[in-house]
């Protein structure tokens, strides 16, 4: 299991940050959270934001509106992830909303992404082919919003052990390590 966060940038593009530890992910998340507005009566129309424990019991209610964009630009979000020694991945670049491609109309060459994510549906439809020319490693995931969706996306990894550092090496294809979506 890798610790991670998904940031909605000021351009409303999603960026996935994966980290070596939960502490690093939490630190990055707190920096993002500090830029988000508080929950108001109007924002409550978007629904409740409960904090649940492992047994499904409500423990608290989130006071920050998590469904809005952070004030970080795309470059700043990637910089934040990297400042916590994380991997920055352009989320679901094949989707028509909240992707770098849909929001900017092109893939920025000046942003230091470690990989791109293709949605699991996009993989099934062969959309990954149009992004291979970007020269970045590809991953896929379930991008789950419901429990039933967990596990829909799969990648194959060739690594020496199951660790964050080995995953990073697989993305970079170092010494025979590999990451593939198909």
Identify the residue ranges that each predicted region occupies.
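Short acidic/polar alpha-helix capping motifs at helix-coil junctions
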Residues: 39-45, 89-94
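Surface-exposed cleft-lining segments at the edges of enzyme active sites
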Residues: 56-69
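Internal active-site segments that recognize and position negatively charged phosphoryl groups
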Residues: 71-81
